[in-house]
Amino acid sequence: INTLIRYFGEYKKRNSDKIPDIKLVLIGGGEVNIPDTIKNDVIDLGFVDIQDKYDACAGAICLCQPSKNESFSIVIMESWLTERPVLVHSQCNVTSDFARESNSGLYFDNYFEFEGCLNYYIDNPQTASQMGHSGRQFVLDNFKWDVVLKKFMDFLEL
């Protein structure tokens, strides 16, 4: 989260003319230290009900999951179900592989790649929308209950 907040602050400084009203919306628990310079541009909602989470994802440019240590990211799947693309850290094999395999997200290794990816989504809303749609299809094709159950049964050869 610290990387995301730091990168967002830098993005605001460098791109204030491009999209001056951009906000970072945080959902979930935990203490977050938000620098005074961007306090007005970061909205920390804390825990919210499921519909509010889906609504927030659906209204976002993208979902950013900067963790390098995810084993499986439910929030990425939820974002894809709302047809929004994702932005993930390239050093997280699981999330970057999901983004590549599904053609539903971009990945970054440093601030300048983060900025480039975010600008790509902003400058190409139709492509971002198509990527989000691909993400939804990826989730439905691979993680719906009947699909998971069939994979499990096939694995057990039942």
Map each language-model feature to its residues.
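Aromatic "clamp/platform" in nucleotide-sugar-dependent glycosyltransferases that forms part
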Residues: K68
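Short acidic/histidine- and often glycine-rich active-site loop of Leloir-type glycosyltransferases
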Residues: P35-D36, M77, Q91-S102, Y107
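Nucleotide-activated donor-binding/catalytic signature segment of Leloir-type glycosyltransferases, i.e.
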Residues: I19, N33-Y54
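Short hydrophobic beta-strand element within catalytic cores of glycosyltransferases
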Residues: P85-H89
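Conserved acidic donor-binding segment of nucleotide-sugar-dependent glycosyltransferases
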Residues: E101-F112, Y120-P125
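A short, well-ordered alpha-helix in the C-terminal region of glycosyltransferases
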Residues: Y120, T127-D141, K151
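C-terminal alpha-helical cap of glycosyltransferases
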Residues: W145-L158
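A conserved mid-protein helix/loop that constitutes part of the nucleotide-sugar donor-binding site
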Residues: I1-K12
